[in-house]
Amino acid sequence: MGNEFRVCDDCQATNVKTLIPKLKKVDSCATIEVACQSYCGPGRKKSFAFVNNRPVAAPTEDELIVKIEAKLNK
């Protein structure tokens, strides 16, 4: 089973236009879903993504990608 990334296009700290290409570099075969994730509180202050149904958040997008790569053991 492949990896799944879920991101919100409505949260203030998440820039979907720049985050999705970075997620594709992490795993080009992963499924990426863009929709409200009901994670609004943390989403106002931190970049986040759900990775295989688990939330991963960081102060910046670059730090988020590092955390996601670590979670996927790349």
Curated annotation (Swiss-Prot):
Family: Belongs to the UPF0741 family.
Pfam families from the UniProt entry: DUF1450 (PF07293)
Stored HAMAP family: UPF0741 (MF_01863)
Protein name: UPF0741 protein BcerKBAB4_5177
InterPro entries, A to Z: DUF1450, UPF0741
Annotated disulfide bonds: none
